[in-house]
């Protein structure tokens, strides 16, 4: 039996594939109807994570992830290990920021660099909660009710 380690589910750009519904559907069948409603093809489920398919994600518009290709060409595990870090591929964007964690990439890269991938995985639930539910407080960053 081939066991996937959680750190193998961290993409080079630091998106955690192990927290994605496309991956989680393998253990959570209740997600399947929701994913199908959003246009995901049944034969594309579950997604094994980007490292398992060498960045050839069926859920991307172009087929292969440019960030994955770049990391592979530069021979780095994570983008922060690259001499060109940070680059525009990791630049935050407001587009779909309310539903996708893409704007976490820079923070995640810095966190992995300083604390390691295992600590990043442990911190992810708080990071996602702070990103999706936090309220900006000038000079303090995103705040949660329990921070007050």
Which sequence ranges carry the predicted segments?
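Cysteine-centered metal-binding/redox modules
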Residues: 1-148
């Amino acid at each position: 039996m081939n066991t996937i380690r959680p750190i193998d589910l961290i993409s080079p750009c630091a998106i955690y594939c192990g927290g994605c519904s496309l991956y989680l559907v393998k253990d959570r069948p209740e997600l399947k109807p929701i994913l199908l409603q959003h246009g995901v093809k049944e034969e594309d489920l579950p997604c094994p994570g980007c490292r398992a398919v060498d960045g050839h994600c069926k859920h991307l518009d172009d087929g292969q992830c440019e960030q994955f290709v770049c990391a592979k060409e530069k021979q780095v595990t994570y983008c922060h290990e690259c001499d060109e870090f940070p680059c525009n591929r990791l630049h935050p964007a407001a587009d779909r920021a309310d539903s996708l964690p893409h704007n976490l990439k820079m923070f995640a890269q810095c966190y992995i660099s300083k604390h390691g991938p295992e600590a990043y995985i442990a911190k992810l639930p708080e990071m996602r909660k702070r990103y999706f539910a936090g309220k900006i407080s000038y000079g303090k960053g995103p705040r949660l009710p329990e921070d007050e």
